[in-house]
A protein has these predicted regions:
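Short, flexible active-site-adjacent loop segments at beta-strand->alpha-helix junctions, enriched
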Residues: 20, 45-47, 74-79, 153, ...
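Contiguous beta-strand/loop segments that form the cofactor/metal-binding neighborhood of enzyme cores
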Residues: 104-167
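Beta-strand-loop-alpha-helix segment that lines the small-molecule cofactor/substrate pocket
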Residues: 2-48, 63
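Alpha-helical elements of Rossmann-like donor-binding domains used by nucleotide-donor carbohydrate transfer enzymes
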Residues: 2, 29, 55-58, 105-106, ...
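Residue-level preference for beta-strand/loop junctions
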Residues: 8, 67, 131-133
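Residues that form or flank phosphate/diphosphate-binding pockets in enzymes
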Residues: 2, 25, 51, 129-130, ...
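Predominantly a Rossmann-like dinucleotide-binding segment in NAD(P)-dependent oxidoreductases
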Residues: 47-121, 125-127
Length: 167
């Protein structure tokens, strides 16, 4: 947060490695600083600019599947990590902050940036360092779209993205 804030206040646009912040308060403070200084702040989530993802967002937001009803996502892999920043809570470790961000970014893109999330169900498996090895979450987006996301360092490899609509 310190270097992002200093860079924004120095008039720089910032592309920050994920996770952007460790919690909503830190993240909001950085976005407030960006807005006050007229600077762009982006979390470095590579999938957001992938041509396949951009095309999916274009088709869905143009109504190709009607109104979005449900989004089903998974980003999971098994790992033998023992000494890695992903296991350190003070460095933004955990499956949710490491790979769950891809799913949340997709929800925002598909809802044209107006995503209001409400968690309806949450389950997680916590590892020995206190980080989540697996997080399984159900959410309601903008009160009309349901979504389910699984993020994990402990489940077999799966990268899935399914969007269901009224058509």
């Amino acid at each position: 947060i310190e270097w992002v804030t200093k860079s924004l206040e120095a008039g720089k646009h910032v592309l920050c490695e994920k996770p952007l912040g460790l919690n909503a308060i830190e993240t909001a403070a950085m976005f407030d600083t960006a807005a006050r200084n007229g600077r762009l702040l982006i979390e470095a989530v590579w999938g957001r600019w992938h041509p396949r993802f951009a095309r999916m967002v274009q088709l869905v937001t143009a109504g190709a599947i009607g109104d979005i009803e449900h989004i089903e996502t998974a980003f999971t892999f098994t790992s033998e990590m023992t000494d890695n920043y992903r296991l350190n809570p003070s460095m933004g470790g955990g499956a949710l902050l490491d790979v769950g961000c891809y799913q949340a970014h997709a929800w925002v893109a598909l809802t044209k940036g107006a995503a209001d999330f409400s968690i309806t169900e949450l389950a997680r498996t916590v590892g020995p360092t206190g980080i989540d090895l697996t997080t399984d979450v159900n959410v309601r987006i903008n009160n009309n779209v349901t979504a389910h996301a699984v993020s994990s360092f402990a489940l077999p490899s799966k990268q899935q993205f399914i969007v269901s609509g009224t058509r």
